[in-house]
Amino acid sequence: RDPRYRGYNRALDASRPVGSLLKPAIYLTALADSARYTLITPIDDGPFVWKSRGAPDWQPANYDKKFHGLVPLRTALAQSYNAAAARLGTEIGIERVLDTVRRLGVDRPMRPFASTLLGAIELSPLEVAQMYQTIASGGFRSPLRAIREVTTQEGRPLTRYPLAVEQVFAPEPIYLLAAAMQDVVREGTAQSLSKFLPPEIAVAGKTGTTDEQRDAWFAGFTGDRLAIVWVGYDDNRAARLSGSSAALPIWGDMMAALAPEPLALAKPEGIELVLIDPQTGLRGGTSCPGATEVPFMQGSAPQERAPCSGTMDAAVETVEQTVQKAKSWLERLFGR
Protein backbone atom coordinates (compact mmCIF):
# COMPACT_ATOMS: atom_id res chain seq x y z
CA ARG A 1 0.00 0.00 0.00
CA ASP A 2 1.14 3.51 -0.77
CA PRO A 3 -0.21 5.91 1.89
CA ARG A 4 0.33 8.81 -0.52
CA TYR A 5 -2.04 7.29 -3.08
CA ARG A 6 -5.50 8.73 -2.58
CA GLY A 7 -7.27 6.04 -4.53
CA TYR A 8 -9.24 5.99 -7.76
CA ASN A 9 -12.46 7.98 -7.63
CA ARG A 10 -14.66 6.20 -10.16
CA ALA A 11 -17.50 8.69 -9.75
CA LEU A 12 -15.28 11.49 -11.04
CA ASP A 13 -12.58 9.80 -13.10
CA ALA A 14 -13.91 6.51 -14.51
CA SER A 15 -15.05 7.29 -18.05
CA ARG A 16 -17.10 4.37 -19.37
CA PRO A 17 -19.41 3.78 -22.35
CA VAL A 18 -22.91 4.77 -21.23
CA GLY A 19 -25.01 2.60 -23.54
CA SER A 20 -28.72 3.33 -23.46
CA LEU A 21 -28.36 6.15 -20.93
CA LEU A 22 -27.87 8.41 -23.95
CA LYS A 23 -31.25 7.51 -25.49
CA PRO A 24 -33.27 10.14 -23.59
CA ALA A 25 -31.31 12.77 -25.54
CA ILE A 26 -32.61 11.25 -28.80
CA TYR A 27 -36.21 11.31 -27.63
CA LEU A 28 -35.92 14.79 -26.13
CA THR A 29 -34.65 16.10 -29.47
CA ALA A 30 -37.60 14.48 -31.23
CA LEU A 31 -40.25 15.61 -28.74
CA ALA A 32 -39.10 19.22 -29.03
CA ASP A 33 -40.39 19.03 -32.63
CA SER A 34 -44.07 18.60 -31.76
CA ALA A 35 -45.16 19.00 -35.38
CA ARG A 36 -43.48 15.67 -36.18
CA TYR A 37 -43.24 13.70 -32.95
CA THR A 38 -45.41 12.96 -29.93
CA LEU A 39 -45.30 10.21 -27.32
CA ILE A 40 -47.53 8.04 -29.53
CA THR A 41 -45.84 8.66 -32.89
CA PRO A 42 -45.11 5.25 -34.49
CA ILE A 43 -41.37 4.51 -34.56
CA ASP A 44 -40.02 1.70 -36.74
CA ASP A 45 -38.13 -0.92 -34.76
CA GLY A 46 -37.39 -3.02 -37.83
CA PRO A 47 -33.89 -4.01 -39.00
CA PHE A 48 -31.71 -0.94 -39.49
CA VAL A 49 -28.44 -0.58 -41.38
CA TRP A 50 -26.26 2.55 -41.35
CA LYS A 51 -23.82 2.82 -44.23
CA SER A 52 -20.76 5.03 -43.92
CA ARG A 53 -18.06 5.49 -46.52
CA GLY A 54 -14.84 3.70 -45.59
CA ALA A 55 -16.38 1.89 -42.63
CA PRO A 56 -18.26 -1.39 -42.15
CA ASP A 57 -22.04 -1.27 -42.16
CA TRP A 58 -23.49 -0.70 -38.71
CA GLN A 59 -26.56 -2.75 -37.82
CA PRO A 60 -27.67 -2.50 -34.18
CA ALA A 61 -29.58 -5.37 -32.63
CA ASN A 62 -32.04 -5.27 -29.76
CA TYR A 63 -31.24 -6.77 -26.36
CA ASP A 64 -33.85 -9.50 -26.88
CA LYS A 65 -32.47 -10.28 -30.38
CA LYS A 66 -35.89 -9.48 -31.90
CA PHE A 67 -37.39 -6.62 -33.91
CA HIS A 68 -40.83 -5.27 -33.03
CA GLY A 69 -42.05 -3.32 -36.06
CA LEU A 70 -43.94 -0.07 -35.54
CA VAL A 71 -44.23 0.87 -31.86
CA PRO A 72 -45.28 4.12 -30.13
CA LEU A 73 -42.38 6.41 -29.31
CA ARG A 74 -42.95 6.06 -25.56
CA THR A 75 -42.83 2.25 -25.88
CA ALA A 76 -39.58 2.39 -27.85
CA LEU A 77 -38.01 4.31 -24.96
CA ALA A 78 -39.61 2.24 -22.19
CA GLN A 79 -38.39 -1.02 -23.75
CA SER A 80 -35.06 0.53 -24.83
CA TYR A 81 -35.30 -0.72 -28.42
CA ASN A 82 -31.96 -0.10 -30.12
CA ALA A 83 -33.10 -0.25 -33.73
CA ALA A 84 -35.90 2.24 -33.10
CA ALA A 85 -33.59 4.67 -31.29
CA ALA A 86 -30.88 4.44 -33.96
CA ARG A 87 -33.36 4.99 -36.78
CA LEU A 88 -34.99 7.92 -34.99
CA GLY A 89 -31.64 9.49 -34.13
CA THR A 90 -30.37 9.37 -37.70
CA GLU A 91 -33.73 10.60 -38.96
CA ILE A 92 -33.66 13.76 -36.85
CA GLY A 93 -29.89 14.18 -37.24
CA ILE A 94 -26.93 12.92 -35.22
CA GLU A 95 -25.53 16.43 -34.79
CA ARG A 96 -28.86 17.65 -33.41
CA VAL A 97 -28.87 14.85 -30.85
CA LEU A 98 -25.29 15.63 -29.82
CA ASP A 99 -26.26 19.28 -29.44
CA THR A 100 -28.97 18.14 -27.02
CA VAL A 101 -26.38 16.12 -25.09
CA ARG A 102 -24.20 19.22 -24.79
CA ARG A 103 -27.11 21.35 -23.63
CA LEU A 104 -27.89 18.72 -21.01
CA GLY A 105 -24.43 19.39 -19.60
CA VAL A 106 -21.85 17.13 -21.25
CA ASP A 107 -18.76 19.18 -22.05
CA ARG A 108 -16.41 16.90 -23.96
CA PRO A 109 -15.70 16.14 -27.64
CA MET A 110 -18.18 13.76 -29.27
CA ARG A 111 -17.86 12.28 -32.72
CA PRO A 112 -21.01 12.33 -34.88
CA PHE A 113 -21.07 8.58 -35.48
CA ALA A 114 -24.32 6.62 -35.62
CA SER A 115 -23.06 4.31 -32.87
CA THR A 116 -22.82 7.32 -30.54
CA LEU A 117 -26.63 7.37 -30.52
CA LEU A 118 -26.60 4.08 -28.62
CA GLY A 119 -24.05 5.23 -26.09
CA ALA A 120 -20.69 4.54 -27.75
CA ILE A 121 -19.34 7.49 -25.82
CA GLU A 122 -17.43 7.39 -22.55
CA LEU A 123 -18.68 9.51 -19.65
CA SER A 124 -18.03 9.51 -15.93
CA PRO A 125 -20.90 8.89 -13.50
CA LEU A 126 -20.68 12.59 -12.56
CA GLU A 127 -21.17 13.63 -16.20
CA VAL A 128 -24.17 11.32 -16.46
CA ALA A 129 -25.54 12.86 -13.26
CA GLN A 130 -25.19 16.31 -14.84
CA MET A 131 -27.24 15.18 -17.86
CA TYR A 132 -30.01 13.70 -15.76
CA GLN A 133 -30.01 16.61 -13.32
CA THR A 134 -31.04 18.88 -16.19
CA ILE A 135 -33.92 16.54 -17.04
CA ALA A 136 -34.99 16.13 -13.41
CA SER A 137 -35.02 19.90 -12.84
CA GLY A 138 -37.40 20.60 -15.71
CA GLY A 139 -34.82 21.77 -18.25
CA PHE A 140 -32.79 23.98 -15.88
CA ARG A 141 -29.08 23.15 -15.91
CA SER A 142 -27.08 23.78 -12.76
CA PRO A 143 -23.39 22.74 -12.63
CA LEU A 144 -22.95 20.04 -9.99
CA ARG A 145 -20.64 20.99 -7.12
CA ALA A 146 -19.46 19.33 -3.92
CA ILE A 147 -18.23 22.55 -2.26
CA ARG A 148 -20.48 25.49 -1.42
CA GLU A 149 -17.88 27.69 0.28
CA VAL A 150 -14.39 27.79 1.80
CA THR A 151 -14.12 29.25 5.31
CA THR A 152 -11.47 30.19 7.84
CA GLN A 153 -10.98 28.32 11.11
CA GLU A 154 -13.34 30.81 12.68
CA GLY A 155 -16.02 30.09 10.08
CA ARG A 156 -15.66 33.29 8.08
CA PRO A 157 -16.23 32.66 4.36
CA LEU A 158 -13.20 33.10 2.10
CA THR A 159 -14.70 31.92 -1.17
CA ARG A 160 -18.28 31.15 -2.10
CA TYR A 161 -19.50 29.07 -5.02
CA PRO A 162 -23.03 30.32 -5.63
CA LEU A 163 -25.63 28.22 -7.36
CA ALA A 164 -25.78 28.93 -11.10
CA VAL A 165 -28.97 28.04 -12.97
CA GLU A 166 -29.67 28.30 -16.69
CA GLN A 167 -32.82 27.25 -18.54
CA VAL A 168 -31.59 25.25 -21.53
CA PHE A 169 -34.83 23.51 -22.62
CA ALA A 170 -38.47 24.52 -22.78
CA PRO A 171 -40.49 22.84 -20.02
CA GLU A 172 -42.93 21.07 -22.37
CA PRO A 173 -40.59 18.58 -24.12
CA ILE A 174 -38.79 17.94 -20.82
CA TYR A 175 -42.15 17.12 -19.22
CA LEU A 176 -42.97 14.67 -22.01
CA LEU A 177 -39.57 13.00 -21.69
CA ALA A 178 -39.86 12.67 -17.92
CA ALA A 179 -43.35 11.19 -18.31
CA ALA A 180 -41.95 8.64 -20.78
CA MET A 181 -39.10 7.84 -18.38
CA GLN A 182 -41.71 7.04 -15.74
CA ASP A 183 -43.02 4.44 -18.21
CA VAL A 184 -39.51 2.90 -18.17
CA VAL A 185 -40.06 2.19 -14.47
CA ARG A 186 -43.76 1.32 -14.64
CA GLU A 187 -43.72 -1.09 -17.56
CA GLY A 188 -40.31 -1.07 -19.23
CA THR A 189 -36.78 -2.26 -18.58
CA ALA A 190 -36.77 -0.88 -15.00
CA GLN A 191 -40.08 -2.31 -13.80
CA SER A 192 -38.26 -4.57 -11.30
CA LEU A 193 -37.71 -1.40 -9.24
CA SER A 194 -41.14 -2.18 -7.76
CA LYS A 195 -39.38 -4.82 -5.62
CA PHE A 196 -37.54 -2.05 -3.78
CA LEU A 197 -39.91 0.91 -3.61
CA PRO A 198 -43.66 1.05 -2.91
CA PRO A 199 -45.91 1.97 -5.85
CA GLU A 200 -46.70 5.40 -4.42
CA ILE A 201 -43.03 6.43 -4.84
CA ALA A 202 -43.05 7.52 -8.49
CA VAL A 203 -39.66 7.33 -10.21
CA ALA A 204 -38.32 8.24 -13.65
CA GLY A 205 -35.24 6.44 -14.88
CA LYS A 206 -33.27 4.66 -17.57
CA THR A 207 -31.27 1.45 -17.67
CA GLY A 208 -28.07 1.12 -19.66
CA THR A 209 -26.05 -1.90 -20.79
CA THR A 210 -23.03 -1.80 -23.11
CA ASP A 211 -21.64 -4.29 -25.63
CA GLU A 212 -20.76 -7.70 -24.19
CA GLN A 213 -22.31 -6.50 -20.92
CA ARG A 214 -19.10 -4.77 -19.86
CA ASP A 215 -20.96 -1.91 -18.17
CA ALA A 216 -24.27 -1.87 -16.32
CA TRP A 217 -25.94 1.46 -15.50
CA PHE A 218 -29.05 2.84 -13.92
CA ALA A 219 -29.90 6.53 -13.74
CA GLY A 220 -33.04 7.66 -11.98
CA PHE A 221 -34.69 10.41 -10.00
CA THR A 222 -37.55 10.87 -7.57
CA GLY A 223 -39.10 14.08 -6.30
CA ASP A 224 -36.03 14.97 -4.23
CA ARG A 225 -33.24 12.53 -5.13
CA LEU A 226 -31.16 11.76 -8.20
CA ALA A 227 -28.58 8.98 -8.33
CA ILE A 228 -26.42 7.21 -10.90
CA VAL A 229 -25.13 3.65 -10.46
CA TRP A 230 -22.41 2.01 -12.58
CA VAL A 231 -21.31 -1.61 -12.23
CA GLY A 232 -18.31 -3.03 -14.09
CA TYR A 233 -14.63 -3.93 -13.96
CA ASP A 234 -11.81 -1.39 -14.10
CA ASP A 235 -9.92 -3.58 -16.59
CA ASN A 236 -12.92 -3.59 -18.97
CA ARG A 237 -13.66 -7.29 -18.57
CA ALA A 238 -17.20 -8.33 -19.42
CA ALA A 239 -19.24 -8.23 -16.22
CA ARG A 240 -22.03 -10.24 -17.88
CA LEU A 241 -24.56 -8.09 -16.11
CA SER A 242 -27.24 -5.73 -17.37
CA GLY A 243 -28.40 -2.40 -16.05
CA SER A 244 -31.64 -3.92 -14.80
CA SER A 245 -29.98 -6.93 -13.11
CA ALA A 246 -26.97 -5.22 -11.51
CA ALA A 247 -27.16 -1.43 -11.30
CA LEU A 248 -30.91 -1.11 -10.69
CA PRO A 249 -30.99 -3.25 -7.49
CA ILE A 250 -28.18 -1.15 -5.97
CA TRP A 251 -30.08 2.03 -6.85
CA GLY A 252 -33.29 0.57 -5.44
CA ASP A 253 -31.70 -0.52 -2.14
CA MET A 254 -30.10 2.89 -1.68
CA MET A 255 -33.31 4.80 -2.40
CA ALA A 256 -35.37 2.56 -0.13
CA ALA A 257 -33.03 3.51 2.73
CA LEU A 258 -33.33 7.23 1.91
CA ALA A 259 -37.17 7.24 1.86
CA PRO A 260 -37.43 9.64 -1.10
CA GLU A 261 -40.32 11.89 -2.03
CA PRO A 262 -42.38 10.64 -5.01
CA LEU A 263 -41.84 12.33 -8.34
CA ALA A 264 -44.77 14.64 -9.09
CA LEU A 265 -44.31 16.26 -12.48
CA ALA A 266 -45.60 19.83 -12.66
CA LYS A 267 -47.62 20.10 -15.88
CA PRO A 268 -46.54 23.13 -17.93
CA GLU A 269 -49.18 25.43 -19.39
CA GLY A 270 -48.32 24.23 -22.89
CA ILE A 271 -49.23 20.61 -22.12
CA GLU A 272 -52.68 19.06 -22.50
CA LEU A 273 -53.84 15.60 -21.42
CA VAL A 274 -55.88 13.65 -23.97
CA LEU A 275 -57.53 10.23 -23.77
CA ILE A 276 -56.06 7.99 -26.47
CA ASP A 277 -57.48 4.72 -27.75
CA PRO A 278 -54.56 2.23 -27.62
CA GLN A 279 -55.93 0.19 -30.52
CA THR A 280 -55.95 3.00 -33.07
CA GLY A 281 -53.78 5.74 -31.58
CA LEU A 282 -56.68 8.14 -32.14
CA ARG A 283 -58.51 10.40 -29.72
CA GLY A 284 -60.53 8.10 -27.49
CA GLY A 285 -63.11 8.37 -24.75
CA THR A 286 -64.39 6.61 -21.67
CA SER A 287 -66.15 4.06 -23.87
CA CYS A 288 -62.84 2.93 -25.42
CA PRO A 289 -61.40 -0.14 -23.62
CA GLY A 290 -58.02 0.65 -22.13
CA ALA A 291 -58.11 4.33 -23.12
CA THR A 292 -55.11 6.08 -21.58
CA GLU A 293 -54.53 9.72 -20.75
CA VAL A 294 -51.46 10.87 -22.69
CA PRO A 295 -49.72 14.27 -22.43
CA PHE A 296 -49.23 16.29 -25.61
CA MET A 297 -47.83 19.69 -26.43
CA GLN A 298 -50.73 22.01 -27.23
CA GLY A 299 -52.07 21.38 -30.73
CA SER A 300 -50.13 18.16 -31.36
CA ALA A 301 -52.71 15.59 -30.21
CA PRO A 302 -54.64 13.65 -32.86
CA GLN A 303 -57.91 15.30 -33.82
CA GLU A 304 -59.58 12.28 -35.41
CA ARG A 305 -61.73 10.28 -33.02
CA ALA A 306 -61.52 6.53 -32.65
CA PRO A 307 -64.63 4.51 -33.68
CA CYS A 308 -65.07 3.41 -30.05
CA SER A 309 -65.47 7.03 -28.97
CA GLY A 310 -69.16 7.92 -29.23
CA THR A 311 -70.93 11.26 -29.46
CA MET A 312 -71.40 11.39 -25.68
CA ASP A 313 -67.63 11.22 -25.13
CA ALA A 314 -67.14 14.02 -27.65
CA ALA A 315 -69.74 16.18 -25.89
CA VAL A 316 -68.17 15.58 -22.47
CA GLU A 317 -64.74 16.44 -23.83
CA THR A 318 -66.04 19.67 -25.35
CA VAL A 319 -67.51 20.73 -22.00
CA GLU A 320 -64.24 19.88 -20.21
CA GLN A 321 -62.24 21.90 -22.72
CA THR A 322 -64.56 24.88 -22.28
CA VAL A 323 -64.23 24.71 -18.49
CA GLN A 324 -60.44 24.48 -18.74
CA LYS A 325 -60.26 27.48 -21.08
CA ALA A 326 -62.45 29.50 -18.72
CA LYS A 327 -60.26 28.50 -15.77
CA SER A 328 -57.08 29.53 -17.61
CA TRP A 329 -58.66 32.87 -18.56
CA LEU A 330 -59.65 33.57 -14.96
CA GLU A 331 -56.18 32.62 -13.69
CA ARG A 332 -54.58 35.03 -16.14
CA LEU A 333 -57.08 37.75 -15.22
CA PHE A 334 -56.57 37.49 -11.46
CA GLY A 335 -52.95 36.34 -11.54
CA ARG A 336 -53.51 32.99 -9.88
Predicted features along the sequence, with ranges:
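A penicillin-recognizing enzyme superfamily signal
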Residues: 1-14, 22, 75, 79, ...
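Short active-site loop at a secondary-structure junction
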Residues: 5-25, 39-42, 67-71, 115
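Cysteine/selenocysteine-centered motifs that mediate thiol-based redox chemistry or coordinate metal-sulfur cofactors
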Residues: 28-32, 38-41, 269-274
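A generic secondary-structure signal for well-formed alpha-helical elements
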Residues: 29, 33-38, 50, 92, ...
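Conserved catalytic neighborhood of penicillin-recognizing serine enzymes
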Residues: 36-97, 113, 141, 152-183
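Mid-domain, small-residue-enriched loop/turn segments at the edges of structured enzyme/sensor domains
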Residues: 55-62, 92-130, 139, 143-146
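Thr-Gly-centered strand-to-loop micro-motif
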Residues: 87-88, 118, 205-207
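Low-complexity, Gly/Ser/Thr/Pro-rich intrinsically disordered linker/tail segments
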Residues: 274-336
